[in-house]
Amino acid sequence: MSDQLELMTGTTVGIKAKDGVVLAAEKRVSYGFYLMSKSGKKVYPITNRIGLASSGILADIQTITKVIRANIANMEIEMKRPVSVRAAAKLLSIMLFQNKYMPYIAETMVGGIDEEGPKLFILDSWGSLIEDDFAALGNGARTAIGLIETGYSSSITVKEAKELAIKAIKEAIARDPTSGDGIDTLVITGNGYLEDSIKL
């Protein structure tokens, strides 16, 4: 168990705003204290209204993203309507739980906007599913969560949430050797999503 937790490298944050959701993560890919890449992508759009962000082993993050993206696309074709954020998160929860004996080494959050408004869900490697207003995952989470908690309010806008997410990740990067090398953000609103990348 402790070996697995040590592999939850990096820092990922999610913030639910009144008009959407912001997901963000730094770009460093490391195994222990070995720096493998400075350009890892850990934040992905799944549909035009749902996104995913994760900390952990990059191969597992990429696999989770591909599988959930394909399953949601199939569901939307079969149902002939968009999948809700909650349904997407539950689908991922089932997928993770089915692999509980050989779990993906990744902590994940799913966020987006649907008819019920903005939603943010947090999942561990075994598929536990928690809905929250904000979250931080990975080695830098302890540093990032304090900043987010201090700056968060229920009336926060996506613009303010993006600034808060970037500030929290920058602070985590300053204190966590497994985090660094830039920040990717994904802002999801009723108009779709917008990706951005910040070099540090």
UniProtKB/Swiss-Prot annotation:
The formation of the proteasomal ATPase PAN-20S proteasome complex, via the docking of the C-termini of PAN into the intersubunit pockets in the alpha-rings, triggers opening of the gate for substrate entry. Interconversion between the open-gate and close-gate conformations leads to a dynamic regulation of the 20S proteasome proteolysis activity. It is an enzyme of class 3 (hydrolase). Keywords: Autocatalytic cleavage, Cytoplasm, Hydrolase, Protease, Proteasome, Threonine protease, Zymogen. GO terms for molecular function: threonine-type endopeptidase activity. It catalyses: Cleavage of peptide bonds with very broad specificity. It is found in: Cytoplasm. It comes from the Archaea. GO terms for cellular component: cytoplasm; proteasome core complex, beta-subunit complex. GO terms for biological process: proteasomal protein catabolic process. The active site is at T11. Its EC number is 3.4.25.1. InterPro entries: Ntn_hydrolases_N, Pept_T1A_Psome_bsu_arc, Pept_T1A_subB, Proteasome_bsu_CS, Proteasome_sua/b, Proteasome_suB-type. Residues 1-10 form a propeptide. Belongs to the peptidase T1B family. The 20S proteasome core is composed of 14 alpha and 14 beta subunits that assemble into four stacked heptameric rings, resulting in a barrel-shaped structure. The two inner rings, each composed of seven catalytic beta subunits, are sandwiched by two outer rings, each composed of seven alpha subunits. The catalytic chamber with the active sites is on the inside of the barrel. Has a gated structure, the ends of the cylinder being occluded by the N-termini of the alpha-subunits. Is capped at one or both ends by the proteasome regulatory ATPase, PAN. Component of the proteasome core, a large protease complex with broad specificity involved in protein degradation. PANTHER family: ATP-DEPENDENT PROTEASE SUBUNIT HSLV, METALLOPROTEASE TLDD. This is Proteasome subunit beta 2. It comes from Caldivirga maquilingensis (strain ATCC 700844 / DSM 13496 / JCM 10307 / IC-167). The lineage of its organism: Archaea, Thermoproteota, Thermoprotei, Thermoproteales, Thermoproteaceae.
